[in-house]
From Swiss-Prot:
Gene designation: ycf4
UniProt family annotation: Belongs to the Ycf4 family.
Function statement: Seems to be required for the assembly of the photosystem I complex.
Name of the protein in its database record: Photosystem I assembly protein Ycf4
Any Gene Ontology biological process: photosynthesis
Amino acid sequence: MNWQSEWLRVEPIMGSRRISNFCWACITSLGALGFFLVGIPSYLGKDLIPVLPSQQIVFVPQGIVMCFYGIAGLFPSFYLWCTILWNVGSGYNIFDKREGIICLFRWGFPGENRRICIRFSMKDIQAIRVEVREAISPRRVLHMKVKGQQDVPLTRISENLTLREMEEKAAELARFLHVSMEGP
C-alpha cells in the first residue's frame, strides 16, 4: 500500500500489531494466568475456579512452582501486549526527490528515543540490493546501499514476500531513485 507521485514515495511499515503477536500474547497470558490460578488456590485450600481443580496440588513444592510459572509467564505476555499497544517497529520510508532526502521513520519503545528517524541524502545511495536466503524459513530482505555506511534494511526480515514481489518492489524503488539494483 505504497503511495507515490513524481517527486515523493511513501512506504508504510507494519510494526508489532500483527496477528501472530496477538496470538502469542493471548497464549502466554492465558497460560500464565492458568498456572497462577492453580497455584494460589493450593495455598488457600479451596478452588477459586471450578474448572481448574487444585485440591490435589500440595502448596509446597507444586503450588509454589505453579505460582512462580504463572508470575514468570506474565512478564513476556506483558511485554508482548506493550509492544502491540505501542506498535513498536511501525513507521514509514519517505523518498523525497525535491528535497533529495530519504527518511526512515520508526516508532520505538516509550522514552527519550521513542521516535527513530534516520535521514540520508539521495546522492549517497549507491544501489538497491535484494538479499535472498532460501532455507526452512526463507529470508528475503530489501537493502539500500549507502556510500560509506552499512547496508540499510528497508523491509523486515519476517515480511513474507515472494521472490517475485521482492524483485518488483526493488525494481520500482531503484527506478524511482535512479540507482542500480543488485540481486542475489
